[in-house]
Amino acid sequence: FSGLVADRLTLLDGSRSECDSDQYGEGSAHQGLLPASEQASRTRRDYVTNSNDRYWISNASSRYEALSPILGPHSNQLSLRTRSNFQETEAILAGGKMDRARAKELTFGNKSLAAELMVDPFVAACNSDGRFVGNCAVLGEWDQRFEAGSKGAYLFERFWNSIRNRNDLWTVPFDAENPLTTPR
């Protein structure tokens, strides 16, 4: 499998008893299904969020203990989309009453946490290098939005996709105790 597919599949070894799905069933709707009591579930009065990423954190102040590995890894790095979702949710709550203009900006803002984290340091580094002055100028003037008229969006997307999986990308590595602000 490719890395993309392998990260999203759970394969069970049918020759091992601990992988026998028939062991599940008590408390579930059907034999072989993981019971709801062993799945991530949270009821809160403030918020829960889900970005189709990791089960272990759906509220910044309340994390799940490790659950069945079938639900995915625990305490691992969140996607930038998930981190951005938490930031936007916290901003909504801190901002008070939601009006139409604010809802529209949050929904259609086309912003990028990757750009917020990377553009300024990249522009500073590439300006000192001198080989990519034109690219640096475009990114330095970019509004860091992905709007039709945002000059620099395509350049950043190409740049980001070429470096996003580098092991040396961040100066502060992922920390499971600070998953919403690391890596950076």
PLM feature segments, named:
Residues 1-184:
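Long, compositionally biased non-active-site segments enriched in small/hydrophobic residues and glycine
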